[in-house]
Amino acid sequence: MTEQRKSLIKLISAVIIILLLPVLFFRFIGDDPTKKAVNSTRQIAVVNEDTGVLSDEVKSDEEDKSAQFGKEVAAVLGERPDYSWTVVNRSAAETGLASKKYDAIVYIPSDFSKNILSYDKDHPQKATLEFSIQDNLNAVNKEKVQRELEDAQKTMNKKMSALYWNFVSQKVDNIRGEFDKIVNKESEFQNVMYNFYKPSSNDLAGEIKQQKDLIDELKKSMNEAQGTTKEKASTAEEAKNTLKEFIDTVERYKEYQENQKKLLLAAQDSTQQQIRTGLDAIQAQQKANQFSERMSGLATGIGQAKTQIGLTNLALNNAEKLRQNQVPLQEMGMKKIENDMFNAFLSRYKSQYEAIKYQNLNQLQENIGKNRLSLLKPKESDEKEDGEDTSDNKDDTDKEDIEDIKLDLEKQRDELKNVATEIKDISEGLKEPEQEKPTTPDAEEPSTDDSPNTEEPSNDIPTSDDQPTNEDTGSSEEGTQDNGSQNDVQTNIETGQKHQESSKNVPEQDTNTENTGTSKTDFSLIELADENDGSNQSDGLQGDGADGETDISGAKKRLNEAAIKLEEIENALQEKQEEHNNKLEKHIDELNQEIKELNKTVSKLNDQIGDLTKKLVDFDNNVNDAYRLIYNLEDEIIQTLQSRGYIDQKEKLSSIFSSRIETDNISNLMKYYNSLNLYKSTLNDNLDLGSLTIIKGEVIQEQDGNVQSVLALTPEESASWEALKNNTMQTDEDINSFIDGMTKFADDYSGYIRDSQAGVLDELTKISESAAKASEQLVTGATQESATFSNDGLSGTMALSVQDTVGQEVLQMSDMMGSLSDRQSGIIDYTTNMQQSVNDVQAKADTLNNNWGKNVASTKLVRNDVYGILGNTLVDGQNNGYVYDYLANPLKISGEVPEEKIQTVPPVVILVIVLISSLLIGYFSSYYQNAPLLVKGALFGILNILVGLMISLFGLNIYSLPDDQTIKWSVFTILLLVASSAFIRTAFRFGSIPGWVASAAMILFYVAPLIDLIMPNFTFEDPVSKVYIDIQYGTGHLFTMGITVLLIITVIAVALPLIIRLMAEHTAESDETYEA
């Protein structure tokens, strides 16, 4: 594949990537990235478990006599527009809450209505509502649900207040009905009394008058009867005189006797008729007399009732006047109490607020001082102490391990010292030969062999660093000298001793090296002894004299003994060496395992160190920002204290703020910043609504006694009402006693009439019997006289005696009639008195009726006053809801509410894809900057136009706009892409470093709006976002300015490379000309 084809493939791949990038980006972010996920259903379940309560004041249906306020509350909640309130049972509500169907549940308990109607009890209970919010809601939706529940609580309180006032008006309505009943009963009583007295008195007067007329007629008849009796008596006298002449004229006497008989019979019939008439009149007169006697007691009772009613009327008038006079006094008292209450409330609240504010400032000032001290002394000692403890523990552990693996060679060291001393003695006892040693290969071999043997122990003896020491080197050099093998052995032994001493202070040893070194040291000593022995023998053979041989043999013997001791030492060392090697191997395994773990830990710590380094940089930046915020807040507090005149607090805080902050502890910084915020908020706080409500309640509670004293009944009014009550009770008692008297009077009058009638009937019976006897005697006399005359046996004496008897009977009857006439005269007088009493009773009944009418009028006035209380709550028998709403919420807050501003968010999605695409196009154009101008321009223009159109089309799916604004949006997006990519291309024209700096600047320019949206304390005025927002939400007047600026930037970015190229060519031509 040629380079040209590779370049073509690269070009096509880059173009495809640039064109596919917007498609992939918009597919990655989704169709509607600005849509907020809502996890709330905006439905609240209401569980109504209210059982209701019976109440006389509640106007309920005939079927349901109980008051159920849970239904009222559910109906009110159902009218709220923001959330859907559904009434369900408990199980359905809890199931819906678990399945996320409802955002919350409101429980109305079973005693809800009962607690609401307990307002007139000694200890009223508040009606409570319980609610449960769904746990899966986010913080925003939970806050919305809580706010909705709080608003619902206000609505329910308003409804409950209206219901309370409804109950009050219903009670007042019941009182009105009771007053209507009282007025009606009093009116009925007045009518009954009037109907009782007026018609009965009139009828009674008429009957008495009629009875009086009858009695007059009876008296007249009795007088006539008495006159007739007297005539009859005179006639009897004449008959007696006539009888004396009877003898003379029998015929005259017979005729006269017949006439007398007729006259007496007629008189007898007339007298009997008059007696019957008189009997009826006497009965009526007796009734009238008895009624007149009893009516005198009735008149007395009515007089007492009249007096009592007069007192009652007087008491009512006094009470009415006193109550009317109390009205202006009560109004003045209420106004005074309101003013006093308001003034007391303001003064107390101001004083309490200032005291609390000053106290809070002092407390917060102390907290600021304490927190500021914590910022001056960073807490590093604890960490150091922890580190030191850890290192100490580690050192202790290492020391313990070293003690465990330390090799105890003290005994062998002592034995080696003894052997070394003996060998030294042997070497001193030996005499050196006087002749020179021949230099042969055999003589040089021991030294050659000794050198490595000597060096090996020095290198292999265990040390702390596993390195050979200088003493080892010295010992090896000494082993190569020709001063004698005894010195070599002694030197090697001393070297071994020094290495053994150094091993006591070394924490780590190499097991294999130590074993090898120790064994080689021992064998080298034995070999040295043998070789020295051999060399001495050879020297002795070459030398002369027997003394040399004796010394050598003795030395050899002693060296053999030393060799035996060395073998024993070697065996002991071998045993300890094996034991020590086992411990070392075990310890080395443990150390290897620890090393592996430490390596892992180190790798993890390296990663953490990298992360912590990044975090440390961010932390330093955050700490610097925190310092700056704290210093600014301190300056604001000092300025506020200076402006408000808090000099003492200003001086104290200035001394506290004068020190510098020298800590990196975020917790202490946050505490200190929180203390400063609390101090600032407390200093700037003006009113506390919570304490305002509490103080208001306290002041109102204190003024309750004054209000009660103003509205309560005064002693005079209470006495008046008590007198009215007593008078009314006395009136009732008088009326009851009057009724009892009337009943007793009727019973007594009935008995009296019966007795009187019995007496009159007895007298009339006697009169009738006398009249019958007289009539019988007359008849008998007439019969006897007829018989006598007929029988001629009549004598004058008999007639005279008969006439005398008749005369006596007539006189007796005349006397009885006179007595009856006298009694009738008494009845007439009694009837006249009774008629006068009846007339007086009528007058008194009229007076009673008038007084009782005044009482009814006073009661009607009271009724009108009662109807005036909350009279507007009922209209045509229906509740006036407007009045109840007014009573529940008498205050109205009016004011202008500023319109909610539409939150304008820049199109961050467009900015991000424009940034990425412009960077890629700029990199691509700079990469092919050596291509022909037409090719570069075509590729640059086509890519910008295609990518810009794609970004605009996909962006319009997210940000919907009208047609004219759509064109502006697309044009501005394409020009923005062209200007950005041209800027990058031009920057890379000057070199890679300017190109990358320009890229970083452009990234910062496009990312700054995102930071502005996220960080509340960061502000960046982005001109590109302003143009987009103006096109999206405004009138588009910034479009022209934005297009102009982009065109200028594009022309400069495109023309600048051409100008630089022309200048470079011109400079090159000048140089060539100059060189030529």
Curated annotation (Swiss-Prot):
Q: Where is the composition biased (Basic and acidic residues)?
A: 423-439
Q: What happens when the gene is disrupted?
A: Cells lacking this gene are blocked in YukE secretion.
Q: Which chain regions cross the lipid bilayer?
A: 9-29, 904-924, 938-958, 964-984, 995-1015, 1040-1060
Q: Which InterPro entries match?
A: ABC-2_transporter_component, T7SS_EsaA
What is the membrane topology noted in the UniProt record heading this document? Multi-pass membrane protein
Q: Does the keyword Cell membrane apply?
A: yes
Q: Where is the composition biased (Polar residues)?
A: 449-495, 503-522
Enumerate the UniProt keywords alphabetically.
Cell membrane, Coiled coil, Membrane, Transmembrane, Transmembrane helix
- Gene Ontology cellular-component terms listed: plasma membrane
What is the annotated localization of this protein? Answer: Cell membrane
Q: Which residues form a coiled coil?
A: 552-622
Residue ranges for the region (Disordered) are 372-404, 423-552
For this chain, the family text in UniProt reads: Belongs to the EsaA family.
General function of this protein: Required for YukE secretion. Probable component or regulator of the ESX/ESAT-6-like secretion system (BsEss). Bacteriophage SPP1 receptor. Essential for the irreversible adsorption of the bacteriophage.
What this protein is called in its record is ESX secretion system protein YueB
What is the source species?
Bacillus subtilis (strain 168)
